[in-house]
Amino acid sequence: MGLFAGKGVLVTGGARGIGRAIAQAFAREGALVALCDLRPEGKEVAEAIGGAFFQVDLEDERERVRFVEEAAYALGRVDVLVNNAAIAAPGSALTVRLPEWRRVLEVNLTAPMHLSALAAREMRKVGGGAIVNVASVQ
């Protein structure tokens, strides 16, 4: 039995890099893992760890809601949320266009706040949980 045996863990940005490593580590510790990513390669990661994959554009509020609701149903519970997904602004402050900057804010700031609220509601059903925010852009 691992440290997170039977616990439901949601990981955003789980297709590669830090997110993939986080999802793999939780799975090794017995967690039930659901990961989301814009990239379809996340499906391979989920299959390799026995988890669930959701292709999600975190800029879209409805997709965030769908992810948490469907992941909670698939796992049976939510105990941990890891807000790992992030995007970088294309270019410098002198060249970035306002719509691009708004997307960065939506994905990097609004989405983690919204996902945290959604996941916290699920965590209350099981007596609590943990939310981890990762601040890294690859």
Task: Name the predicted role of every residue range.
Residues 2-34:
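Canonical Rossmann dinucleotide-binding motif of NAD(H)/NADP(H)-dependent dehydrogenases/reductases
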Residues 84-89:
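Conserved NAD(P)H cofactor-binding loop of Rossmann-fold oxidoreductase domains
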Residues 116-117:
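A short, exposed helix-loop element centered on a Lys and neighboring polar residues
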Residues 136:
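Residue(s) in the substrate-gating loop at a strand-loop-helix junction
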